[in-house]
Amino acid sequence: MANTKKIYSCNNCGAKYPKWMGQCSQCGEWNSVDEEIIQSKKKNESNITINKSKLKEIKEIETETNERIIINDNELNRVLGGGIVPGSVILISGEPGIGKSTLILQISISINKKVLYISGEESQQQIKLRANRISDNQTQCYILTETNLELILKSVESLMPDVIVIDSIQTIQTDSIENIQGSTPQIKECTSTLIKVAKQTGIPIIVIGHITKDGNIAGPKVLEHMVDVV
């Protein structure tokens, strides 16, 4: 049976408090403390067993040579160290209206790979009109307008794309926790799940994130440390 309790955490530094505070005493940020619902499930320690097959000496671990996905943009390839690394999670942030979605859509329809573009902000028709302005070659780019993480993962399992795009992380929510869409716990939980998917499948995920009026990425500060590239 899951136990539920409420705590309050700072979006800026991650400090936690038993009650709401107008100013975070750790970093000094005002109005950055939000309610967070934590659900914990007690595990029976006697049922926990060690899987010895997962233990490997480092010299016995085999590595795979996975080629990076090359982008038709020399500057972006340079920034990413030569292209998109399989299984990596890339966070693209910027002010609203600056062109994040257009840039990522341009990449999606130009890399000649099967791309699943998930939008929680625009309709398929809006994305199609923008794609028409970018290029006539629009094959292998699949558009899904959805905000529920569980339904998104079902689409990923069905399509098994080469690249996944999330536009934007602030619009995605999971049924596994009760917090509202865009809240700090939702962003952390959804990002954590997407990272697991990327590492387990080898599918790189490009995540678009908004920034605040202060120029910081909206949501928990830890988000920047969870992903591979910002």
Task: Annotate each predicted stretch with a short phrase.
Residues I195-V230:
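Phosphate-binding/switch region of NTP-binding enzymes
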Residues G22, V79, I127, D167, ...:
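Residue-level signature of catalytic and energy-coupling elements of molecular machines
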Residues S101:
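Walker A/P-loop
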Residues A2-K5, K16-S93, S110, K114:
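Detector for small/aliphatic-rich hydrophobic stretches
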Residues G87, E95-I98, Q106-T193:
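Conserved inter-motif catalytic segment of the P-loop NTP-binding fold
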